Amino acid sequence: QVVNRGGHLPGSDFELVSWSQGEVLHNFSSSEGAPNAPTNRPASIEKRRLLFLTGIVVDLETSLRNISNVKEQGGKFHIAMVARANAAAKKLDSVLSVIAAPGIADVTSNIPKPIGTDSAIDPNAPKGLADAITVFLGSSDGTNLKALDPMISNSTKGQPYGG
């Protein structure tokens, strides 16, 4: 309703690495000096690789969940979420072409490509993606994801605080 009738945007062009490494670095709990005197340092390349993959998976997961729960078929929100899901699925396919992530690949193999406004989305797909990325993150420290480096943006959202 907020998008379809209220004119609000259905989302932003969010990319986890650039947003989490800009003016607000999200490393305080794990940074040098934590918990008493944490530093505001950028994430390591290994951590940025994991953030990059996580951001894409969460974008697809959220978009699929939104499509599954849409109230107005063919409305602005529905169309925007289908476009967003297709963009995220395309990015994820690119990622999966250069890294091994079998659990994630298994879930994405059951997602229609491309997704249309009339596509049936497996109601278990969003949770399947969430579970798969959780398992993946528990088994990877990012060192095995070097192939993602050319895909990861070096730009940030805002300038980091220098303190």
Listing of model-derived features with the role each one plays in the protein:
Residues 1-162:
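Primarily the internal scaffold of c-type cytochrome electron-transfer domains
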